[in-house]
Amino acid sequence: MATPYISMAGIGKSFGPVHALKSVNLTVYPGEIHALLGENGAGKSTLMKVLSGIHEPTKGTITINNISYNKLDHKLAAQLGIGIIYQELSVIDELTVLENLYIGRHLTKKICGVNIIDWREMRVRAAMMLLRVGLKVDLDEKVANLSISHKQMLEIAKTLMLDAKVIIMDEPTSSLTNKEVDYLFLIMNQLRKEGTAIVYISHKLAEIRRICDRYTVMKDGSSVCSGIVSDVSNDDIVRLMVGRELQNRFNAMKENVSNLAHETVFEVRNVTSRDRKKVRDISFSVCRGEILGFAGLVGSGRTELMNCLFGVDKRAGGEIRLNGKDISPRSPLDAVKKGMAYITESRRDNGFFPNFSIAQNMAISRSLKDGGYKGAMGLFHEVDEQRTAENQRELLALKCHSVNQNITELSGGNQQKVLISKWLCCCPEVIIFDEPTRGIDVGAKAEIYKVMRQLADDGKVILMVSSELPEIITVCDRIAVFCEGRLTQILTNRDDMSEEEIMAWALPQE
């Protein structure tokens, strides 16, 4: 076999105490399309950021074109022919096609001893590159006027302008129509014939089988298997992705389903988002005291649905009912007043006020629900604020020196407890947890699970979004699986709640 252009051996990457990559091996040959597979959080994106020079590895060796490196920076990686195209495209809509192709690297020529931009030469080279990728657009066209497919071709052209030998593509078909996917694959096949290697990250197994030559599967920050795509079945790939270790990964195990009567109190009927690609025709019901989990791949529509339910995003249709009444929130404030709470996946961006104390953060949501108190800015009087905070501190076993200390001084797990307590002050009936244990340690996770189960036992309806399959299997009574904006299955039988079964419903079938 030919000499590999890239060989990554024993790559590790730590962020403080968190080992994002443990020991990863990856080999990519010239003229091959190599699938990089794995669950959410397996380490695929981190590995590609190491290869493209964005992250410095903690250990391991990267060999490119027979030269070994302990680390790369972004500039060196580009010089060595490593290009990356992210799922969120980096082209700038306000600039023209030509300007996007030459951002930060204009060609120049000397006239009378002065360097000036050589627009003529740039146009000639740009036209040749667009011809190479089959992109028929005017160089002076604003990128904002291009389709998603054309923007993607422009990204490929930008990468090739840097003489890329390896192109990393992260979920490149996520926003493309079937016809546009066909066109992308046509260009990829042409690049393969020219000797360009492509690392292809995707969860769409039908696409992997159609376009890729070899594969590497990652799990929990390690590479577990590599081989030829035609030698394995889709079931084999799914088993490699999820492994064999299931419910026992966490110490905190879910006890029996709540003893509360199976009384349906929360219903979602035919909810569709205004952007119909995000959420389409979703219906389900939840009983009092039940934890309903939402599983699926990144971009499957879970968080988008929660935003619709809580009034963050507008709905095109559908109804949300609580205790038999249509509550369909028009805004987050309306949702709070109607008995809902939302603990978002981003604590720092959407969850807490970093300049406020623990007590002040706890007081915010109740102030909003009740329309304000007599204190300044509509918050509690200080005495009420302190009393409530101390009660919540004891209830949730919050570890802090004082409820008056700044919330940013707490660990991630304790910050999450503050967010939970903030919403408990509103006495909600429905609580949405979106990635409730992201970024916190195993011990803190167990405490959060315990809190969620206590809330369910108290009669609350819990909606839990999580990308960690062992977690969602452990904690939830039932699991709703999403794929590409649709609810594909609700798993109710404990025997069916395996990682393999969830992934089978979460992966696109076409």
From Swiss-Prot:
Cellular location(s): Cell inner membrane
Catalytic reaction annotation: D-allose(out) + ATP + H2O = D-allose(in) + ADP + phosphate + H(+)
Q: Which GO terms describe its cellular component?
A: ATP-binding cassette (ABC) transporter complex, substrate-binding subunit-containing; membrane; plasma membrane
Instruction: Indicate the segments forming the ABC transporter domain, all copies.
Output: 6-245, 260-509
- Major subcellular site: membrane
Query: Cross-referenced PROSITE patterns, in alphabetical order?
Result: ABC_TRANSPORTER_1, ABC_TRANSPORTER_2
Q: Please name the GO terms of the biological process aspect recorded for this protein, alphabetically.
A: D-allose transmembrane transport; D-ribose transmembrane transport
Q: How does it sit in the membrane?
A: Peripheral membrane protein
Q: Mind listing the UniProt keywords for this protein, alphabetically?
A: ATP-binding, Cell inner membrane, Cell membrane, Membrane, Nucleotide-binding, Repeat, Sugar transport, Translocase, Transport
GO MF annotation list: ABC-type D-allose transporter activity; ATP binding; ATP hydrolysis activity
Q: Which SMART domains match?
A: AAA
Q: Which residues does the annotation say bind ATP?
A: G38, E39, N40, G41, A42, G43, K44, S45
Q: List the EC numbers from the record.
A: 7.5.2.8
Q: Which Gene3D superfamilies match?
A: P-loop containing nucleotide triphosphate hydrolases
Disulfide bonding pattern of the chain: none
Task: Report the superkingdom from the record.
Answer: Bacteria
**What is the role of this chain?**
Part of the ABC transporter complex AlsBAC involved in D-allose import. Probably responsible for energy coupling to the transport system.
Q: Which NCBIfam families match?
A: PRK09700.1
Subunit comment: The complex is composed of two ATP-binding proteins (AlsA), two transmembrane proteins (AlsC) and a solute-binding protein (AlsB).
Q: Which family does it belong to?
A: Belongs to the ABC transporter superfamily. D-allose importer (TC 3.A.1.2.6) family.
- According to UniProt, the name of this protein is D-allose import ATP-binding protein AlsA
Q: Which gene encodes it?
A: alsA
